[in-house]
């Protein structure tokens, strides 16, 4: 089974109202949204602790980006949920996610929560 197949199905079926299509780029899954923005999902499969990044690119629309990741970037070590952190509209505006993310949550469910967040923003 392809690495991103389950995530593509989640996006295309559960979020069909805002997702136009998905594209497996090999190292990441790209999700195209109705507002002409896109979300990239990438994650590791070889580390003991799964690392992931969910990045929503909107710079061409309103100069914003949103990104949730758990890379242990020391720059964000003061964030309460470190290593998990959320880039809110700008790369250097970082804090806790605007939705709950339990450290035991499966990546598929974290992905769903991010897509719900994107749905609210894209249709506002």
Give the positions of each predicted feature.
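Negatively charged, low-complexity tracts enriched in Asp/Glu with abundant Ser/Thr
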Residues: 1-40, 45-49
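Intrinsic disorder/low-structure terminal segments
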Residues: 3-6, 14, 37, 81, ...
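Generic "edge-of-domain/loop-turn" microfeature
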Residues: 36-38, 48, 61, 73-75, ...
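Generic alpha-helix signal with a bias toward terminal, lower-confidence helices
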Residues: 43-45, 51-55, 78-80, 111, ...
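An exposed acidic His-Trp-rich patch
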Residues: 53-101
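Well-ordered alpha/beta subsegment
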Residues: 90-124
């Amino acid at each position: 089974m392809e690495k991103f197949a389950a995530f593509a199905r989640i996006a295309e079926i559960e979020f069909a109202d805002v997702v136009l299509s998905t594209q497996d780029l090999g190292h990441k899954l790209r999700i195209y949204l109705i507002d002409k923005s896109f979300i990239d999902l990438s994650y590791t499969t070889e580390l003991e602790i799964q690392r992931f990044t969910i990045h929503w690119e909107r710079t061409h629309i309103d100069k914003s980006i949103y990104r949730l990741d758990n890379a242990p970037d020391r720059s964000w070590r003061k964030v309460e949920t470190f290593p998990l952190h959320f880039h809110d509209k700008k790369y250097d505006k970082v804090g806790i996610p605007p939705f709950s993310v339990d450290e035991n949550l499966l990546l598929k469910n974290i992905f769903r929560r991010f897509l719900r967040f994107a749905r609210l923003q894209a249709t506002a």
